[in-house]
């Protein structure tokens, strides 16, 4: 839906387009928007049960941003259980711990975005756009 709307539009000049879900971890996991990557933002305040409670969302994720990590000292969160849950549902769990308050992880998040953009641009130049129809994606 989003992908189709972007074809032939002025949006082609964008390097990144973020589409945020409706605010929960269950609804948007089953919809294909034509996206190139899936990133799940999981706040440490949500608890360690979320990967096992919403496995589809995490299984489809290319990356999990574990957010609000500056709050960890104030929470009763079992980080090992959370990481175990991610390992059980994700083919290759990739996690970046992030704090907007302290800035921890922001450089890693930006580097990951740039690396993914570069890979996708190279695939597009080689004609391997990756989602079933031929054209350039940069």
Kindly label every feature range from the protein language model.
Residues 1, 33, 52, 56, ...:
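Generic recognition of short, well-ordered alpha-helical segments
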Residues 1-19:
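Conserved nucleotide-sensing/catalytic segment adjacent to the nucleotide-binding pocket
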Residues 2-6, 25-28, 50-53, 83-84:
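A generic local structural motif
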Residues 9-10, 21, 28-46, 53-66:
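Inter-motif core of Ras-like GTPase G domains
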Residues 13-15, 35, 92:
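A generic structural signal for alpha->beta connector loops
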Residues 23-25, 44-49, 69-72, 101-104:
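Conserved nucleotide-binding/hydrolysis micro-motifs of P-loop NTPases
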Residues 70-127:
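Canonical P-loop GTPase G-domain recognition
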Residues 125-138:
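Histidine-centered metal-binding segments
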